[in-house]
Amino acid sequence: MKQRPTILDVAKQAGVSKSTVSLVLQGSASVKDETRKSVRKAMTDIGYVYNRSAATLRSASSGLIGLVINDLRNPFFTEFAALFQMELAKAGFATVLANSDEDPKLQSQMISSLVEHGVSGFIISPSYGEEAATLSVLDAANTPTLQVFRSLERAEGTYPFLA
């Protein structure tokens, strides 16, 4: 099985340093347009695919937002999720969508799983019911969180709320 091309392969193909390729991948303005085009062409020519997981390990920011909705079968929440996802994309974020189906236990499990996958933040429309498990996971994650439409009563003042 052939190995995936690396940043070093791109640098060699483009005739630049590994640091220059890294700057291009980060979108740095300090790279000349001609060099940027050369690096992008080299990436295409050798089939280089940016490894976002590796970048996440280096930067500690995944660019992923966990959007946890209480009931995606409700057309209101479906529309909200679609619109919010598009707005997040405009800001450079990818969205991971989770439906808690009004189950607080499932909600806390989903949030925990999203934390394990390294989301950079949460937007949650909390499920009704027991809040302790969800709050415990959110508190331990220390991840920016915005509550929408509903708020966790015991989280008042801890996580911003937007209705």
Model-predicted segments: where are they?
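Alpha-helical recognition/docking segments in bacterial nutrient-uptake
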Residues: M1-K2, A60-A163
